[in-house]
UniProtKB/Swiss-Prot annotation:
Pathway membership, UniProt: Purine metabolism; IMP biosynthesis via de novo pathway; N(2)-formyl-N(1)-(5-phospho-D-ribosyl)glycinamide from N(1)-(5-phospho-D-ribosyl)glycinamide (formate route): step 1/1
Cross-referenced InterPro entries: ATP-grasp, ATP-grasp_carboxylate-amine, ATP_grasp_subdomain_1, PreATP-grasp_dom_sf, PurT, PurT/PurK_preATP-grasp, PurT_C, Rudment_hybrid_motif
Coiled coil: none
Gene name tied to this protein: purT
The protein, known as: Formate-dependent phosphoribosylglycinamide formyltransferase
Length: 389
């Protein structure tokens, strides 16, 4: 049965979700704050407005009367989703989940205080003075982040008290929404970090994808690979934590649950997103029998999901813009990437550039049992051949 889906946020993840939805005969209205966003290029209709404007959001919902609302970004007046859900519209995964996960304070307190998950030690700060006091308790180095942000915006690794004032201002500048409050956490000496894609269903058990390893810079994803080779006991603990936190947040869909892994100290819950995850773009290489976007769509629609299996190993590496321009971006080097075997190039179709904006991704694959480190190197080398200008 065809459903009308209102997609809030139309970036590269939303684009892949729309493609999955269209393959199942769904009708999608893609929304974002700027025209020509990637998901708009493949949707049935689009709307351009600020999703932080609650009245504008209500007006778009009243106009299109969707069956399902699928948030793809954090910059949404999320409290409006509660009353839309009460009116009978399915919010993905749930209004509760979207509200909790867009605010690091809400999700961290739920995880650490209510559910008892192991997390980094943390405090909140509403002023520079509070930040300085918290840093004395935690020590250095420490991590400072806005309560509301994405893709590493406003995040700093602070190594001394002299850097706190700069971190305060940078955090406030990178904050989304109206709240100017930061979270300060101890820096975990981790050996690796993973994303555990977790699928909650309307009428089925919670499922887990093979763990995805990833490398970040400035809090933003640069490369990912699957499967991450981790201690089996660490994987069990991560699955236990992911199951617990997603059950508490309620709803059906895919979740990107992030963890720090330490050989010495075990598994730490970091954060989660109630939607397809950027590190999960590696699944576009066919690493699983169902990629993360197909899994999200099936969970949203209540369609059956078979056992998730690892079909082959994969790696992804991002293509960043070295410039900021309102002109349409151009690309060089695509031909070189296309010469590579078992390699896919994805240009997202963003209409303009920002410095270090993610403009595309290269994904590579190889048979199970192949050298994953060599595949990662191949993927990064291929991505480096693409120039944005």
């Amino acid at each position: 049965m065809t459903k009308k889906i209102l997609l809030l946020g139309s970036g590269e993840l939303g684009k892949e979700f729309v493609i999955a939805a269209k393959r199942k005969g769904q009708y999608v209205i893609a929304c974002d704050s700027y025209a020509g966003a990637p998901a708009m290029q493949v949707a049935d209709e689009f709307e351009v407005f600020s999703m932080l404007d609650g009245d504008a959001l209500d007006a778009v919902v009243a106009k299109h009367k969707p069956d399902i609302i699928v948030p793809e970004i954090e910059a949404i007046r999320t409290e409006r989703l509660y009353h839309l859900e009460q009116e009978g519209i399915q919010v993905v995964p749930s209004a509760r989940a979207v509200n909790f996960t867009m605010n690091r304070k809400a999700i961290r307190d739920l995880a650490a205080k209510e559910l008892g998950l192991k997390t980094a030690k943390y405090f909140y700060a509403k002023s520079l003075e509070e930040l300085q006091e918290a840093a004395k308790e935690i020590g250095f180095p420490c991590v400072v982040k806005p309560l509301m942000s994405s893709s590493g915006k406003g995040q700093s690794l602070v190594k001394s008290a002299d850097e706190l004032e700069q971190a305060w201002h940078y955090g406030c500048e990178g904050s989304r929404g109206d709240i100017k409050e930061l979270i300060i956490e101890e820096f975990i000496q981790f050996d690796s970090e993973i994303t555990l894609l977790t699928v909650t269903q309307k009428n089925g058990p919670t499922l887990f994808c093979p763990p995805i390893g990833h490398v970040q810079k400035g809090g933003d994803y640069r490369e990912s690979f699957q499967p991450a080779h981790i201690d089996p006991e660490h994987l069990k603990e991560a699955q236990r934590m992911a199951d617990k936190v997603t059950a508490a947040l309620t709803g059906a869909g895919i979740w990107g649950v992030e963890f720090f892994l330490s050989h010495e100290n075990g598994v730490y819950f970091s954060e989660l997103s109630p939607r397809p995850h950027d590190t999960g773009m590696v699944t576009l290489a066919g690493t699983q029998n169902l990629n993360e976007f197909e899994l999200h769509l099936r969970a949203v629609l209540g369609l059956p999901i078979p056992e998730i299996t690892q079909e082959r190993i994969g790696a992804s590496a991002v293509i960043l813009s070295p410039i900021a321009s309102k002109e349409a971006p151009r690309y060089r080097g695509e031909e070189e990437v296309c010469k590579e075997t078992n390699t896919y190039l994805r240009i997202f179709g963003k209409p303009y550039t920002k410095l270090n904006r993610r403009m595309g991704v290269v994904v590579c694959y190889a048979p199970n049992g192949s050298d994953l480190d060599a595949l990662r190197d191949k993927c990064k080398a291929a991505a480096a051949k693409v120039e944005v200008y």
